[in-house]
Amino acid sequence: MRHVIFRVEKERYGLPLSAIREVVLPPATFSRVPRAPRAVVGVMNLRGRVVTVVELRELLHLSDASSPMQKVVLLDRGRRDLGLLVTEVDGIESVEKVSPPPGHPSPSVRGITRLRGLAVTILDPEGVDGAVAALFGHK
């Protein structure tokens, strides 16, 4: 199965290509959403559609760092537009085997794979969507 591989800081992540609508550059500024959870960067206008953008680093509870977030990965979620702010997109790769994640992983994590000797955490698009919905108190 083909996956979009991207980085959040130095960590590599992947999402199934079938779950991605497109990858775009972030706007110079996002429109802030009052009282939004910390992970919500804001909203952006993309060709007339309002897209909620979430900082994946914050959603996954990764440490704060200073690397600039340079890409927005847009999930194909039907009627709702959701963007994930990431450090960089590395490309599209074929992922053959995904091992179960160790310990008690987040529902956002499907498993772990290795590409060119490097670990890649494969995310579950439904789990990511659910984590974002939970930020707003939805189930």
Please provide the spans of the model-predicted regions.
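An acidic, low-aromatic, low-complexity terminal/linker signal
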Residues: 1-139
